[in-house]
């Protein structure tokens, strides 16, 4: 793969079971194991799926009208069994409304299609989950 396709974040331990993830642009997300107000890795996984879809749908529909409500809820079941830990039954639910009028009607007309386009083709995160890809875990020195 090329440098153009490479994406990366760096994660550093900040305390017992607490970490900070940083991107090249300076963004920081605090991550923890479920205590306090940090996100867990599973919550970040769900957030990544939802945010990816939200960005896709919003970028398509807001060209026509800004939404009056735009909410996304992502749910899934965390499974622990002999096959190991994983998520199942992932679902992304969009609640989106637009103002009355011609622009709002145009945005509403694109809503179903934009959600489907995000699911079928645009959202890198959910597409990667659905298609599947190996994850290499390596120890570096």
Question: How would you describe each model-predicted region?
Answer:
Residues 1-47, 57-141:
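Extended beta-strand/beta-hairpin segments
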């Amino acid at each position: 793969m090329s440098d153009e396709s490479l994406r990366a974040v760096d994660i550093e331990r900040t305390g017992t079971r607490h970490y900070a993830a940083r991107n090249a642009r300076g963004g920081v997300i605090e991550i923890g194991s479920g205590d306090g107000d940090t996100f867990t890795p599973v919550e970040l996984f769900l957030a990544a799926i939802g945010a990816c879809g939200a960005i896709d749908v919003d970028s398509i529909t807001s060209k026509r009208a800004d939404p009056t409500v735009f909410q996304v809820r992502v749910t899934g079941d965390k499974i622990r069994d002999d096959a190991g830990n994983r998520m199942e039954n992932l679902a992304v639910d969009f609640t989106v409304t637009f103002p009355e009028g011609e622009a709002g009607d145009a945005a509403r007309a694109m809503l179903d299609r934009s959600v489907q386009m995000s699911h079928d083709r645009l959202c890198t995160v959910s597409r990667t989950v659905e298609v599947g890809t190996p994850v290499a875990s390596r120890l570096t020195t």
